[in-house]
Every structure is written in C-alpha cells, then in structure tokens.
C-alpha cells in the first residue's frame, strides 16, 4: 500500500536497497561501496570504470559530498569487507492506455486537417518557403546565455519551429559534447523555489551546482591535472577537450594565449614562439595591482573559446564554449615583469534584452579566497553605472557565484545604510545608488533578515548581527588591506555594436 504525504496524495513506496558482498570482478557502475578517503571510510558511488595496465581504476562520487571531490581511485581504496549497495535494475516503461489510443472522432479529424492546413501555410522566417512542422528541428540557443541551454517549456511546436528557423543551426559537435536540459515543470523543481536558506546551502554543499542537472552530476571529469604558469591545478568538472587528453597525467595550458597541449615538449616549443603576454583586448582599467582587459568574442574567437573550455573545468553549469561572438569578456590580470597573468573574468552579452550585466563569472582556483571574486562583481556594477543602467547577473549562478554575489550585495547595502544621513532610504533609492536591480535589493534584504513589517509599513532594519559582521570586516581590512575598484581609473565608454556583431556568426 502506498504512503500518503501531508497533502493526502499517495506516494510510491521506495524500492528496498539490495545489499551484499562484492569482489573486484563483480563491481559495476552504480554500486555504492565504502572507500578510503583521508583516513576514513566513506560511502561512494561508482560512476565509471576503466582498465589500465596496473589494474582497474574507478571514478567515484562520495555520497552527500560536493561533486568537486569526485576522483579516480585504484582498487586498493575500496573496502570489500563491507557490504555494497547494488544499483536498482531498470524498470521497463509501462504503456498507458489513454484517450490517445482511441479512434479519433470525425470532428477531431476535421480539426486536425484544418490545423495541418494552417501549419503548412506558415512561411519559413528565413527563406519564405512553407515549413513542414513534422521536420521541426531542435531550437538553437541564439539569444540565450553563454552558460545556459534553455527553451521555454510553454512554447508550442510552431513557436519552437519559428525559433529554430530564425537562427543558424549549431555545429554537429554539440551532439557529442553538450547535454540538453529538460525544463518540464516537475513538482521537485517547483518546490526547489520554496526552499529555506539552510536547505539551499545544504544543497549547494552536497551538489556544487544551482542547475541540479542529474546528467551533468554523473558526468566523469576527463582531465587529471593542469599546468598553467607556475601552478598545478586539479580540475573539478568535465570539459570537452580532445578525447586523447584524458589518457595523459598532465595537460599544459599556456597562461597567456590559453592554447592547450598534452605533450610537454610541444608546449615548450609553443612557448618559445608565442609572443602574447596579456589578454588580447583593450586595457580599460589599471591600478597598482591589477588590470582589466575588454576582449570581443567576435574579434578574438579562438582565445575566447579557449577561455570557455578552461572555465568549463570549474563551472559545471556552463554548456556552451563555441558561441562567443555575442559576448564581451572582461578579464582581470595581475602584472609582473613576465606579463599579465589571468586571474578571472566575467562575460557579458553585447545586447542583453533583459538588461543583464553579467553572463558568466569565474575566478581561477589558484586565485580564489583572495578577494578577486568581489573585484570582478564590483567591476561589473561599475560598468553598469557608466552605462546608467541597473544590472543583474543571469541565472542560474554557480554555487560559488551565488555565495559571492550575496556577500557583495549585503556588504554594499550595509555600507550605504550605515552612513550618516541615510536613515530613510527606499529600495528604489538603494538600487539607483548601487546599480543593482530592485529585485536583487529586495531579495538581499529578505535573505539577511533586514526587512521588517512595522506599523503597517515595510522598513529596512540593520540587525545587530549584520552590524557586527560589517565591523569585523572593517577590522580585517585594516589589518590585511582591501582591494577596491577606483572609478577614476576606468577608461571606458559603453561600446556600440552593429547588428551583425551582436548576432551569432556561423
């Protein structure tokens, strides 16, 4: 008998977990076993198995841990003295008998014929020829976010056909490297928007992504290690580099031109010839420590694609790496006698219909927890101020991106509200002063419990906890120093683009 939830609806009883002892020969994908991790036994799921000369190796995901910890292990780390959990067998799909199996009525046949005539009479948006709805192709991502693959769920078949006809189709390589996302409105997705802050943080901790795409979660990381400049880096996620790169222990990336090599000798030969010592764009900001370069995705297509490939190693929700023409890339770099070393970047649509000021943001792992992420966010809002617009990042953000933005929003609002003479300010005034959207201002006030209902009105309140955190940050900045954007050093005017430079260029 099924179990009923709090709403009285019947829910399916979960299938019992099958357990038993296993050997190295019987372990298969989907098995959950106890694995040695940092001197402790932790439950891990086998996601992939590969055979090597020295024996099999297993790619595992540690249950209830962030997927960034997924790794290849050898058989000696699997404790077979404990029982394992066997994967559930795949159930055959049941054919449901419904109204669709019945013979259509005469009226329905007439409506179907009428609908067919209407569709066949619809001209193609590009060629002007009639479009056959039965040959509808998958819609392209034109006009979408650089790191998102989304088709509105409420589009009819005709609307999707019109969209795909209005843009240039994607290259064939996407069928191999990219994974589509289903946007059906499930109950689980609906309830995710109602999660508390604690539940949301817990989900970020264990999954590492705001997208929650189950196909991405189980995708195997394909590179072992990177050498970029003086740093050896361990990738976090899959990125569609050449398949042969997964067989080498180290991939070499030129930190200036971002070219990639699976052979050290080839990399050294390239370095002896490569003359690039900074991101290939206009330097629009320089202070004592850092510089910002504006790189046009259309003019520097190869470099920007290489940048997106590199980013995919650390952003699991990023799905595009070749459609860079409609984007500008603002790259932050530190300077020394050898050149300008890439620290991080954010991308921005040249013409965002929704008014977004950022599409994708990343601080490279070797520079994280040094305050550079906050500088990238602050710089994006400084550009919005120069444009005279309110800006907001596109969603979904990665887990680190979301936490960084919320911290920046809170600190920015508290700095304004704590100033003398600002005792009475509205959300609209805060938005104008910070170039944040009113929605972001409102959500930040709600998340940090700074919005209260008092005597029939909503008022902004600086709680003792918020003020204490602000004072601690100021004390830390006095000791360690702080990095801030100086608007006077920004040499930039909002660029103006032609119609051709804003669109996909295939």
From Swiss-Prot:
GO BP terms in the entry: DNA repair; DNA repair-dependent chromatin remodeling; positive regulation of heterochromatin formation; regulation of transcription by RNA polymerase II
Where the record places motif ESA1-RPD3 motif is 301-322
Tudor-knot domain residues: 27-80
Segments forming C2HC MYST-type zinc fingers:
251-276
Q: Where is the composition biased (Basic and acidic residues)?
A: 83-96
Pinpoint the site Important for catalytic activity: 360
Q: Which residues bind acetyl-CoA?
A: 359-363, 368-374, 398
Instruction: Return the annotated region ranges for Disordered.
Output: 83-155
**Keywords (A to Z) from UniProt:** Acetylation, Activator, Chromatin regulator, Chromosome, DNA damage, DNA repair, Nucleus, Transcription, Transcription regulation, Transferase
Q: In which family does this protein belong, per the annotation? A: Belongs to the MYST (SAS/MOZ) family.
Q: What is this protein called?
A: Histone acetyltransferase ESA1
Organism source for this protein?
Aspergillus oryzae (strain ATCC 42149 / RIB 40) (Yellow koji mold)
């Amino acid at each position: 008998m099924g179990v009923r939830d709090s709403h009285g609806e019947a829910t399916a009883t979960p299938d019992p977990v099958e357990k038993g002892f296993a050997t190295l020969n019987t372990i298969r994908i989907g098995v959950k076993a106890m694995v040695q991790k940092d001197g402790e036994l932790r439950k891990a799921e086998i996601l992939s198995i590969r055979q090597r000369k020295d024996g099999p190796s297993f790619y595992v995901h540690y249950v209830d841990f962030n997927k960034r910890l997924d790794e290849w292990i050898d058989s000696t780390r699997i404790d077979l003295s404990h029982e394992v959990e066997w994967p559930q067998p795949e159930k055959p799909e049941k054919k449901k008998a419904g109204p669709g199996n019945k013979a259509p009525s005469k009226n329905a046949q007439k409506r179907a014929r009428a609908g067919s005539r209407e569709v066949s009479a619809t001209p193609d948006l590009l060629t002007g020829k009639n479009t056959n709805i039965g040959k509808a192709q998958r819609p392209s991502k034109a006009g979408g976010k650089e790191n998102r693959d989304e088709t509105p769920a409420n589009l009819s078949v005709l609307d999707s056909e019109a969209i795909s006809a209005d843009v240039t189709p994607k290259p064939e390589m996407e069928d191999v490297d990219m994974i589509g996302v289903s946007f059906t409105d499930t109950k689980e997705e609906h309830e995710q928007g109602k999660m508390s802050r604690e539940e949301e943080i817990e989900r970020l901790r264990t999954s590492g992504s705001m997208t929650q795409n189950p196909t991405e979660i189980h995708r195997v990381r394909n590179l072992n290690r990177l050498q970029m400049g003086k740093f050896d880096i361990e990738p976090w996620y899959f990125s569609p580099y050449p398949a042969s790169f997964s067989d080498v222990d180290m991939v070499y990336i030129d930190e200036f031109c971002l070219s990639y090599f699976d052979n050290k000798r080839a990399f050294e030969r390239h370095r002896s010839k490569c003359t690039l010592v900074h991101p290939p764009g206009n330097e629009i900001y320089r202070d004592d420590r850092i510089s910002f370069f504006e790189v046009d995705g259309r003019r520097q297509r190869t470099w920007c694609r290489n940048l997106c490939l590199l980013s995919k190693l650390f952003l699991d929700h990023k799905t595009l790496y070749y459609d860079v023409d409609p984007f500008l890339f603002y790259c932050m770099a530190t300077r020394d006698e050898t050149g300008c070393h890439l620290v991080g970047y954010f991308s921005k649509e040249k013409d965002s219909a929704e008014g977004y000021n950022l599409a994708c943001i990343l601080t490279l792992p070797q520079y994280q927890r040094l305050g550079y992420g906050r500088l990238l966010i602050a710089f994006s809002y400084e550009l919005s101020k120069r444009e005279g617009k309110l800006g907001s990042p596109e969603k979904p953000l990665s887990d680190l991106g979301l936490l960084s933005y919320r911290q920046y929003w809170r600190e920015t609002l508290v700095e304004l509200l704590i100033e003398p003479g600002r005792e009475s300010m509205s959300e609209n005034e805060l938005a104008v002063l910070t170039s944040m959207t009113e929605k972001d201002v409102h959500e930040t006030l709600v998340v940090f419990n700074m919005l209260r209902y008092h005597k029939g009105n909503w008022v902004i309140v600086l709680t003792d906890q918020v003020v204490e955190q602000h004072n601690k940050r100021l004390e830390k900045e006095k000791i360690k120093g702080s990095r801030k954007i100086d608007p006077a050093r920004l040499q930039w005017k909002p660029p103006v683009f032609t119609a051709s430079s804003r669109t996909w260029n295939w």
